[in-house]
Amino acid sequence: MSTTPETADFTEWQQVVDLLRQAALEQKDDVMLKLLLTPDEREALLARVNILHELMNGQRSQRKISELLGVGVATITRGSNELKHQSDDTKEWLASLLKKQQQ
């Protein structure tokens, strides 16, 4: 008889975050993300980063961001709504992080 559990070993979002954190510590974050995400999903993630960047920048309308990035306005709106739920400290941290990565 097998003693293999009938449930998934990874059931919480925090476990995924911890897995990514450990991969980063081992300088294998790129490998892990490529294993977890298809090329299309990586492109979608890139679009999401650009959406956050454009929303934080505040110089373009959601419609213009949609046209620039080739994503639906609803996707931009979801990103905007998520940002609205974040603290000012989180928004400042994100703005700083995005600015550092741009350089």
Curated annotation (Swiss-Prot):
Predominant subcellular localization, coarse grouping: cytoplasm
GO annotation, cellular component aspect: cytoplasm
Keywords (A to Z) from UniProt: Cytoplasm, DNA-binding, Repressor, Transcription, Transcription regulation
Compartments, record wording: Cytoplasm
Segments of the chain annotated as binding DNA: 62-85
Signal peptide region: none
GO molecular function, a single term: sequence-specific DNA binding
Alphabetized InterPro entries for the sequence: Trp_repress, Trp_repress_bac, Trp_repressor/repl_initiator, TrpR-like_sf
Gene Ontology BP terms: negative regulation of DNA-templated transcription
Presence of the UniProt keyword Nucleotide-binding in the record: no
Gene3D superfamilies: TrpR-like
Top-level division of the source organism's lineage: Bacteria
Pfam families: Trp_repressor (PF01371)
Subunit structure: Homodimer.
Function: This protein is an aporepressor. When complexed with L-tryptophan it binds the operator region of the trp operon and prevents the initiation of transcription.
Family indicated by similarity: Belongs to the TrpR family.
PANTHER family according to UniProt: TRP OPERON REPRESSOR
The protein, known as: Trp operon repressor homolog
Originating organism: Photobacterium profundum (strain SS9)
